[in-house]
Amino acid sequence: AAEAGIRSYIETSGFANADVLARISPLTDCFLFDWKLTDPALHKTYIGVDNSLILHNLRYLAGQHKRIVLRCPIIPGVNDCTAHFEGIARLASSLDAIDHVELMAYHTMGESKKGQLGRVDSFRAEIPEQEQKQQWLSQLRALGCDARLG
């Protein structure tokens, strides 16, 4: 693909065995890497596992000098707080491979798919207004991040 000028991107939660990343890393131009929660305990509460493996894998890819877009889903009432934004900024500034931070606002586009799969999810959050998204963006930029809305 590279010989033909085709770039390869991998979207990942980062929750994978390191050997998987080691195999795909040489074939990948950029990783779209989700960073959901900075606090390990909150990550375990909402996701079911802490974020230590995810952080390890992010650092591994950065050490491979891979281009990384740190994608941060922001959910009102869950991770739209100063502590999380400060954590994102610290993480992004500590890894040269991070090209930029992409904020992704909470949405409900996957709700119908859950129903089709027979999954029931009681989680609900407010869908943020554009003004709120801009405030998040401003907050991250004030912390020194090259942040964008996704």
Model region roles, listed by residue range:
Residues 6, 119, 145-146:
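Short aromatic/hydrophobic-glycine micro-motifs
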Residues 1-109, 115:
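Conserved AdoMet/S-adenosylmethionine-binding subsite of the radical SAM
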Residues 115-123:
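Short glycine/proline- and charge-enriched loop/turn segments
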Residues 131-150:
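A cross-taxonomic marker for long C-terminal extensions/tails that follow the last structured domain
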Residues 125-131:
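C-terminal catalytic and target-recognition region of SAM-dependent MTase-like enzymes
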